[in-house]
Amino acid sequence: MAQEQTKRGGGGGDDDDIAGSTAAGQERREKLTEETDDLLDEIDDVLEENAEDFVRAYVQKGGQ
């Protein structure tokens, strides 16, 4: 019984597309990280100013 080996070639020339999508993904990740940090900073500010009212409002809305 003979066994055949086959080699699969790469996508051939798609490296630029991969690099472009990687750069776009990195940019999107950085933007989302920045937006998340801004939101967390805003939450921290609210909690520093008025933690008790924040907790009361949360519990009144059905939070546990």
Curated annotation (Swiss-Prot):
The domain-related comment in the record is: The N-terminal unstructured half of Pup provides a signal required to initiate unfolding and degradation by the proteasome but is not needed for pupylation, while the C-terminal helical half of Pup interacts with Mpa to target proteins to the proteasome.
The family line of this record is:
Belongs to the prokaryotic ubiquitin-like protein family.
Lineage of the organism: Bacteria, Bacillati, Actinomycetota, Actinomycetes, Mycobacteriales
Could you tell me which pathway this protein works in?
Protein degradation; proteasomal Pup-dependent pathway
Q: Give the modified residues of type Deamidated glutamine.
A: Q64
Annotated source species: Mycobacterium tuberculosis (strain ATCC 25618 / H37Rv)
- Here the cross-link named Isoglutamyl lysine isopeptide (Gln-Lys) (interchain with K-? in acceptor proteins) sits at Q64
GO BP terms, alphabetized:
modification-dependent protein catabolic process; proteasomal protein catabolic process; protein pupylation
Q: What post-translational modification does the entry describe?
A: Is modified by deamidation of its C-terminal glutamine to glutamate by the deamidase Dop, a prerequisite to the subsequent pupylation process.
Enumerate the UniProt keywords alphabetically. Coiled coil, Isopeptide bond, Ubl conjugation pathway
Q: Which Pfam families match?
A: Pup (PF05639)
More info: The glutamate must be located at the C-terminal position to be coupled to the lysine substrate. Fusion of Pup to a nonproteasome substrate targets it for proteasomal degradation in an Mpa- and proteasome-dependent manner.
Q: What is this protein called?
A: Prokaryotic ubiquitin-like protein Pup
Stated role: Protein modifier that is covalently attached to lysine residues of substrate proteins, thereby targeting them for proteasomal degradation. The tagging system is termed pupylation. Among the identified substrates are the FabD, PanB and Mpa proteins.
Q: Where is this region: Mpa/ARC ATPase binding?
A: 21-58
Query: Which InterPro entries does the record cross-reference, listed alphabetically?
Result: Ubiquitin-like_Pup
